[in-house]
């Protein structure tokens, strides 16, 4: 049945449309883009097999996290970037200054987003970017900043003066995923997502209490920065969202309509907060979120009509059906350089930029073929990022576990997010320990493994010509799986 479906999609594309290329995903990580001395970085996602003369629209991806947390390489941001690259976009996923201990970072966080747009335009030639076709997208706090980036022009007086002073910061299409559009009216919700009239949240990032400086709060709200010349806006919001009330999208749409600004809104029944373009299990959300975002960008950044947008998406579906192992858009599993020498006990030498670098993969690594090695290991205390479900009590059923090589992780189970999660070996098997609210609350979640349990390991660093993905195929005391090595193209320069 699957083969017939793939054949049908391919025939339709051949008979009625153009030959739409579906691109390999390349990534260049840890790129400085702000003024000297700033630690925030960005990652570039790009079509790795593009022709030398091809040019692509760009998209700035802005992570969420309540303006106080989150990271550019979280699962949602990886999913969005990977999907867009497949469809022929160059993306940058950015870090920006975060609020700490109640201290406000407005408007520096917003200016960081503007600087990212400037960086893309300054580096347009290296990125194969069409400089006057740049969009933005973000979720939650990132949705707020994305919408503000779309509508907040020079008249706000917040254009960055360095390091790219004078470079255009405008974008041509903005996507808001469940972001706060009016900071003065961010409602608390009932358990089913129904907003509570008159009860409001008050984020600390603004830098002043609303009673002290109400104009500052209004100024930082996208809904108050609209202009008839603003670019098209797409909003997606779950009606079951208990973090950001869906009235935010509703009120923003009304304001956009009143200004005559082209916009679309999708309110999604039964969906809560923090969704990406796909379900972690690679199932589409009920409202077809992914094709809606593709269609919006294809129309406004590529100039396609609705028929061509559908052909483009159908081509992606056909490609994914024919390449099921290459549709895991939740972690890119990146390593750096070429595997050069096996030192034993999981230690390998890789070559990068003419230098030899030693890395630790696992104690059981052997070359399986030119592009594959096998690996087995799960270490107690390893930083993890998991996807699955939690029951009413304490158990977690995992479909996927990402093993990270950084000092932080993020565990997302349905609509629940935990920071700083680690694997723990207990008498009853593996568990995940999570820390919430600093050190105030620790929880140990026993793991149950679904029939489709997979583990991915991600090594962080600049990508040159090696993409690494580890897929665990069984759990028997210790993990056993395979590490896939795929050649990628280098994006030279910063």
Question: Which residue ranges define each predicted feature?
Answer:
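Conserved alpha/beta-hydrolase "acid-adjacent" motif
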Residues: 242-251
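Short substrate-entry loop that stabilizes the transition state in hydrolases
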Residues: 50-56, 62-104, 144, 156-157, ...
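Short beta-strand/loop motif that positions the catalytic acidic residue
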Residues: 229, 235-237, 241
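Catalytic nucleophile-loop/oxyanion-hole region of alpha/beta-hydrolase
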Residues: 71-80, 92-131, 280-288
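Primarily recognizes the serine-hydrolase "nucleophile elbow" in alpha/beta-hydrolase
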Residues: 118-190
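N-terminal cap/lid segment of alpha/beta-hydrolase-fold proteins
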Residues: 18-54
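Mobile cap/lid helix-loop segments that gate and shape the active-site cleft of serine hydrolases
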Residues: 19-26, 150, 185-225, 231
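Short, flexible, surface-exposed loop segments at domain boundaries
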Residues: 317-358, 368-448, 452, 456-494
